[in-house]
């Protein structure tokens, strides 16, 4: 059996940035911590519905629930509720070993039955798991004490990686069957480091440390997470001392705040990227329009001027840390060529091509301002784009229904660094996470889903990335650096996935 515990990305301690250490101003009272969070939590089931694939709320889910296989802050795999996992030699079966002695938040024992039920539920189309097409690839599970085997229906090279990613959470079988979906929303339980004490939708979440957590009780006894979706309000929260930790604030505010007495921070590159979806509707069916829209954008200028040098430009949906990153794939910034392409389709600055671009505002640092700047760059070459602002939840709703505007800004998270979970799901037509449906790309990607030769698989994805860049099927923008500001009385470990985890925080 091959146990898949290899590190996915080449981060070491240095790449993580220092664990930021400071002194005084301990959170309000000993054992109390308040965090100003940037998004609301729409649902408590981390395995169903649009919220399950929202990378920005995974830190909340990971505080209450455990994933099958956890990731360390550098994104390497670690033993968790599964202590061993892997395939047999011909990849026809999987084997897993389940940690013993773990309890759910209600005191009931966690068992291998919970693992199997969670996997079967995730693979059932009726459940509503947005990643069901991955989980259905293994069935016929058998339990022998704390050992589990399953039959591979269709080989998926990233099956175990998904156990550390979106929807890869273990749910409580007996409790869920007892209370049902509605009861679970009212009183969720997991095996994670924190238990839900109180939850007010669109207001706050109060967590209480799990004294029986298998990984050790967290340092902070009580954690209050305020849902503060406005970036300026998050700045006020941390500056006033009302909150001791916040994230995703404008970079100029980050620089200003960490220079103040009593505050510190970290701002390292994470696995998130900023991108613009192109939907294969209306004017986006014209390759000249797409290529012009890509060539007109000066990504380096966006990073240097708008993001104050934080983050880095990208030309594909892969960052340098992802497995299929290919530095040879370059897309030039060439406004003159963009004008020529538009002219060939009958457009000019005097007679511009028109479409709508959708974006969030304050969800990520400078998201709206970045789109404003891009619209300005487009205007100079003959593209007139009108901006429509929406909440992130609306983006998921529209994307799942394939009803995004011709262009839509988005923050794509890929904590496992695999090309299937970046290029694959973002551009493969049948995926519920893509709005580009052209058959040429579908045909090119299809053989890669089940490719057993890892070298061939990664090379295949690199070829897909090159083709997408040539056809301008998407507009990759930047790899994000995530700003976190905190009181010097709190130590914060930045997680490369972008998840802000109170269980990793300690008093200084």
Task: Identify what each model region corresponds to.
Residues 86, 97, 132-175:
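Surface-exposed binding/hinge segments that line
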Residues 62, 72-76, 165-218, 222, ...:
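Gly/Pro-rich hinge or "lid" segments in bacterial periplasmic/extracellular proteins
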Residues 484-508:
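Long beta-strand-rich cores associated with HINT superfamily self-processing modules
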Residues 92, 288, 384-395, 421-488, ...:
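Extracytoplasmic/peripheral linker and loop segments enriched in polar/acidic and small residues
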Residues 206-211, 259, 285-376, 380, ...:
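Append "and occasionally in soluble cytosolic enzymes with long acidic Gly/Pro-rich linkers
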Residues 210-256, 384:
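Ligand-site clamp/hinge motif
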Residues 201, 343-414, 428-429, 454, ...:
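Ligand/substrate-recognition segments at binding pockets and active sites
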Residues 37-89, 120, 189-190:
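N-terminal lobe/hinge region of extracytoplasmic solute-binding protein
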């Amino acid at each position: 059996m091959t146990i898949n515990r290899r590190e996915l990305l080449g981060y070491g301690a240095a790449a993580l940035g220092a664990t930021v250490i400071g002194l005084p101003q301990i959170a309000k009272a000993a054992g109390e911590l308040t965090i100003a969070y940037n998004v609301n939590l729409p649902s408590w089931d981390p395995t169903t519905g649009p919220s399950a694939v929202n990378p920005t709320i995974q830190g909340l889910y990971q505080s209450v629930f455990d994933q099958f296989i956890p990731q360390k802050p550098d994104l390497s795999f670690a033993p968790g509720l599964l202590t061993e996992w892997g395939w047999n030699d011909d990849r026809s079966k999987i084997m897993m070993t389940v940690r013993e002695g773990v309890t759910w938040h209600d005191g009931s024992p966690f068992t291998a039955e919970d693992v199997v039920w969670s996997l079967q539920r995730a693979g059932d189309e009726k459940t509503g798991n947005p990643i069901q097409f991955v989980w259905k690839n293994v069935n016929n599970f058998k339990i022998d004490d704390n050992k589990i085997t399953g039959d591979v229906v269709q080989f998926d090279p990233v099956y175990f990686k998904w156990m550390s990613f979106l929807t890869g959470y273990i749910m409580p079988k007996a409790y869920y069957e007892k209370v049902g979906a509605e009861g679970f929303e009212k009183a969720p339980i997991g095996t994670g480091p924190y238990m839900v004490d109180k939850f007010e939708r669109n207001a706050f979440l109060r967590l209480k440390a799990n004294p029986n957590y298998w990984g050790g009780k967290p340092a902070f006894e009580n954690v209050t997470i305020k849902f503060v979706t406005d970036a300026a309000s998050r700045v006020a929260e941390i500056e006033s001392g009302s909150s001791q930790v916040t994230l995703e604030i404008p970079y100029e505010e980050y620089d200003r705040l960490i220079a103040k007495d009593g505050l510190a921070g970290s701002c390292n590159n994470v696995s998130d990227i900023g991108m613009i979806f192109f939907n294969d509707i209306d004017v986006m069916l014209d390759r000249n329009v797409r290529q012009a829209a890509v060539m007109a954008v000066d990504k380096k200028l966006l990073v240097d001027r708008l993001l104050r040098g934080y983050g880095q430009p990208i030309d594909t949906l892969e960052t340098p840390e992802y497995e299929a990153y290919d530095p040879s794939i370059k897309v030039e910034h060439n406004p003159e060529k963009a004008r020529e392409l538009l002219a060939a389709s009958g457009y000019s600055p005097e007679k511009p091509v028109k479409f709508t671009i959708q974006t969030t505002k304050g969800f990520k640092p400078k998201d709206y301002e970045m789109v404003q700047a891009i619209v300005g760059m487009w205007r100079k070459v003959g593209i007139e784009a009108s901006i429509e602002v929406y909440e992130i939840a609306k983006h998921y709703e529209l994307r799942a229904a394939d009803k995004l505007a011709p262009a839509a800004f988005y923050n794509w998270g890929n904590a496992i660094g695999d090309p299937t979970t970046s290029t694959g799901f973002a551009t493969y037509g049948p995926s519920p996470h893509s709005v580009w449906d052209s058959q040429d790309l579908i045909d090119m990607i299809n053989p890669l889903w089940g490719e057993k030769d890892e070298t061939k698989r990664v090379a295949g994805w690199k070829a897909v990335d090159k083709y997408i860049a040539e056809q301008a099927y998407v507009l990759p923008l930047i790899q994000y650096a995530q700003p976190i500001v905190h009181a010097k009385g709190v130590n914060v470990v930045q997680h490369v996935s972008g998840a802000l985890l109170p269980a990793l925080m300690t008093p200084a």
